[in-house]
From Swiss-Prot:
Lineage of source species: Bacteria, Pseudomonadati, Pseudomonadota, Gammaproteobacteria, Oceanospirillales
Gene name, Swiss-Prot/TrEMBL: rpmI
Region Disordered, annotated ranges: 1-55
Key word Ribonucleoprotein present: yes
InterPro entries attached to this UniProt entry: Ribosomal_bL35 (IPR001706), Ribosomal_bL35-like (IPR021137), Ribosomal_bL35_CS (IPR018265), Ribosomal_bL35_sf (IPR037229)
GO MF term list: structural constituent of ribosome
Pfam families to which the protein is assigned, alphabetical: Ribosomal_L35p
Name of the protein in question: Large ribosomal subunit protein bL35
Compositional bias of kind Basic residues: 1-25, 32-47
Organism encoding this protein: Hahella chejuensis (strain KCTC 2396)
């Protein structure tokens, strides 16, 4: 049986950590002028994937 291919879009967006998966916060790529400095600062750090979404991410990444 051939090797499973991971979804390349998911591989670019999610990274495996010891506690699960991390991802970049949304709403940070464009139209930043109307967003406050505080809002942009809080959107900056990486976030943990919700535990209910972890099985889907694992399946997309073939883990």
């Amino acid at each position: 049986m051939p090797k499973m291919k991971s979804k390349s879009s998911a591989a670019k967006r999610f990274k495996k950590t010891a506690n699960g998966f991390k991802h970049r916060q949304s709403f940070t790529s464009h139209i930043l002028t109307k967003k406050s400095t505080k809002r942009k600062r809080h959107l900056r750090p990486k976030k943990q994937v919700n535990p209910s979404d972890v099985p889907l991410i694992k399946r997309m990444l073939c883990q």
